[in-house]
Amino acid sequence: MTTTENVSIPGAPGVNPSADAIISIRNLRKWYQVGGGFMGFGDKIYLKAVDDVSFDIERNKTFGLVGESGCGKTTTLKLLLGLETPTAGNIYYEGEDVATMSKAGKSEFRRSVQAVFQDPWSSLNPRMRVRSIVGEPLEIATTMTKGQIATRVGDLLSETGLNPYQANLYPHEFSGGQRQRIGIARALALNPKVIALDEPVSALDVSIRAQIMNLL
């Protein structure tokens, strides 16, 4: 929805996060300027991709964000992951505002909140072998040896319905459903506290969907 707004974008006041939630979203907004305001004159025109959204994600719970196509679900996910900067609002992780976290705090947040994206074709680096794609988080965020990482990668591939011997292949050698399973294996590598998923089983065969959901 595109609307005309004043130059000033109102910022909703922050509300304290829930004590029971691992993630709290408060008054979150993401507005994109799509016109107007030329040379500082006139009203700017904004596309309100996300407008005043608030919710809590409790520990050890499954939380679903449901809405029609184009209503802002994927943008909300990107804001949660720090891939987009909010126009206004707050994102809390374990009670702490992510925007004001220390460097160490943000590193812990990135380790603890992983993602699986909807498009398995663009979410994997085509120049990397699967063993590197799945093992990269372990190389960066742990002190595991190469042998331990290789074992962990094999286990993750098995758990997501892939053959560990496929670790030496490249993404283009897999089907779309298999690529999505690689993305899920990568997201599970660090045993995260939160996994944010953008329609994660939409590209999978019916026979594998239940297996993946049970694994998650």
Residue ranges and their predicted role:
Residues 89-97:
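Conserved ABC transporter NBD signature motif
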Residues 189-193, 209:
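A short, proline-enriched helix->beta-strand linker immediately N-terminal to the Walker B motif
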Residues 39-44, 98-114, 132, 140, ...:
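ABC ATPase NBD coupling module
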Residues 97, 147-165:
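Conserved ABC ATPase "signature" region
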Residues 170-174, 178:
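Conserved ABC ATPase signature
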Residues 184, 212:
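Hydrophobic anchor residue at the start of the ABC signature
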Residues 81:
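Helix-to-loop junction immediately C-terminal to a conserved catalytic motif
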